[in-house]
Swiss-Prot record:
Keyword Nucleotide-binding: yes
Family: Belongs to the tRNA(Ile)-lysidine synthase family.
Compartments where found: Cytoplasm
Record note on domains: The N-terminal region contains the highly conserved SGGXDS motif, predicted to be a P-loop motif involved in ATP binding.
Protein name as annotated: tRNA(Ile)-lysidine synthase
EC number(s) recorded for this UniProt protein: 6.3.4.19
UniProt-annotated binding residues for ATP: S27, G28, G29, L30, D31, S32
One Gene Ontology cellular component: cytoplasm
Keywords: ATP-binding, Cytoplasm, Ligase, Nucleotide-binding, tRNA processing
UniProt GO MF annotations: ATP binding; tRNA(Ile)-lysidine synthase activity
Reactions listed under catalytic activity: cytidine(34) in tRNA(Ile2) + L-lysine + ATP = lysidine(34) in tRNA(Ile2) + AMP + diphosphate + H(+)
Primary gene name: tilS
Keyword Oxidoreductase in annotation: no
Stated role: Ligates lysine onto the cytidine present at position 34 of the AUA codon-specific tRNA(Ile) that contains the anticodon CAU, in an ATP-dependent manner. Cytidine is converted to lysidine, thus changing the amino acid specificity of the tRNA from methionine to isoleucine.
Length: 425
């Protein structure tokens, strides 16, 4: 295919109609380099201002040289380029999260409203097949979306209808690690798909067809259920169990970054059926609120309320307090991080001691006053000790003692960790 053919496809689809500035995620591979060539050549026709963003993962000897070459490429094209270096323990998931966090920073800094990636049809096949093997919920088998709105930005994948073989051979960098089968996606690409294509030469087309069919069903159900108020439980429960599940799943599609597992979805169903009033965080900064025959799922407002020497910390929030950084459900990195098992079900209270405080230790209730005396804790330290409380019980006296019979929950929605780092040394 010729470059003008790709331009015509972009114009026909109207990918950039609503955008004046676009950030291109530039890895240096063939697909992203060719997308760079098309977008930079036809900026005027597409009416966009192009900005480049690259993440140096620091995993290969060639990484730094490739970064320098991309800087030269950007300078020759007279385009701005932003580069960030990945650090820490490498994993596919951590690297992906790092990239998208960085891309959003670049967009915020530049005022861009579109993020463009070079995902193509081969990536789509691999993604759908990976999710199928992992047992992902049906709606996620529709694969990567061509256009996806996340908050105030739109992710655009204009190559999703093309295969890698459609791209001309131009200057690019080869990542030799793609040939190694250490990572799951590489095993899919290098081993599983080629073997299955021996059984069915059109296996890739079959996978893409399934993904498109699931997407059609998903969109049709959303359209047909548009006038059903799923948040009205009386209305929801008037349908069969099967229809309830489909309607609830369609409702959850409104929250693309929620991503409940099958077990978590089943628990939400159970809560809606069994609890008259309920409120608790569920996942990724969302909470479920139920009041009799109504419910809603919404984002938890980031906040930490401080009243009368007491701080209330909500799930998936962080706060610095009296020389410590407290992180509720968000891991901290470092050698001296304390970890306390807690629950997502309710907020954590951090305070100083009160008269009558009791800690459960080894199955016995012990007054803090007596505990401090037994441990020979100085008066000054007693008064400054931070008490961590949840469900009305003391979970821990920071640096002194922990309730080893703190509430234990049975499901993966409710279990989490409070991470604590001393920041005032």
């Amino acid at each position: 295919m010729r470059e003008p053919d790709f331009l015509n496809h972009f114009l026909k689809k109207g990918y950039f109609k609503k955008h004046a500035k676009a950030v291109l995620a530039l890895s240096g591979g063939l697909d992203s380099m060719f997308l760079f060539k098309v977008l930079s050549t036809y900026q005027k026709e597409l009416e966009i201002e192009l900005i480049l963003a690259h993440v140096n993962h620091k995993q290969r000897i060639e990484s730094d040289w490739e970064e320098k070459e991309l800087r030269k490429l950007a300078a020759e094209a007279e385009l701005p380029i932003y580069i960030s270096n990945f650090s820490g323990e490498f994993s596919e998931a951590r690297a992906r999260n790092f990239r998208y966090d960085f891309f959003q920073e670049v967009m915020k800094k530049t005022g861009a409203t579109a993020l463009v990636t070079a995902h193509h049809a081969d990536d789509q096949v691999e993604t759908i097949f990976m999710r199928l093997i992992r047992g992902t919920r049906l709606r996620y088998l529709s694969g990567i979306k061509e256009k996806q709105v996340v908050g105030e930005i739109e992710i655009i994948r204009p190559f999703l209808h093309f295969q890698k073989k459609d791209f001309p051979s131009i200057f690019h960098f080869e990542d030799t690690s793609n040939q190694e089968n250490h990572y799951f996606r590489n095993r899919i690409r290098n081993s599983y798909l080629p073997e299955l294509e021996k059984e069915n030469p059109r296996f890739r087309d079959a996978i893409l067809g399934i993904g498109n069919e699931i997407l059609d069903y998903d969109l049709a159900i959303a359209e047909l259920s548009n006038n059903i108020n799923v948040e009205d439980l009386q209305q929801l429960f008037s349908y069969s169990e099967s229809t309830q599940r489909v309607l609830l799943q369609t409702y959850l599609n409104r929250f693309p970054d929620l991503n409940l597992t099958k077990a978590q979805f089943a628990e939400v169903q159970q809560i809606l059926k069994s609890k008259s009033q309920y409120r608790h965080p569920i996942k990724n900064g969302y909470e479920l609120i139920k009041e009799y025959q109504q419910f809603q799922i919404c984002k938890i407002s980031p906040q930490a309320d401080e009243k009368e020497d007491e701080l209330v910390l909500h799930y998936q929030n962080q706060v610095a307090y009296q020389g410590y950084l407290f992180s509720f459900g968000l891991p901290l990195e470092g050698e001296l991080i304390q970890q306390i098992p807690v629950s997502r079900e309710t907020s954590i209270h951090i305070r100083h001691r009160k008269t009558g405080d009791v800690l459960i230790k080894n199955g016995h209730r012990k007054k803090l006053r007596r505990l401090f005396i037994d441990l020979k804790i100085p008066m000054e330290k007693r008064n400054s000790a931070l008490i961590i409380e949840q469900f009305g019980e003391i979970v821990s006296i920071l640096g002194i003692a922990t309730n080893n019979l703190s509430k234990k929950t049975k499901n993966d929605i409710m279990n989490t960790v409070l991470y604590i780092e001393k920041i005032d040394r």
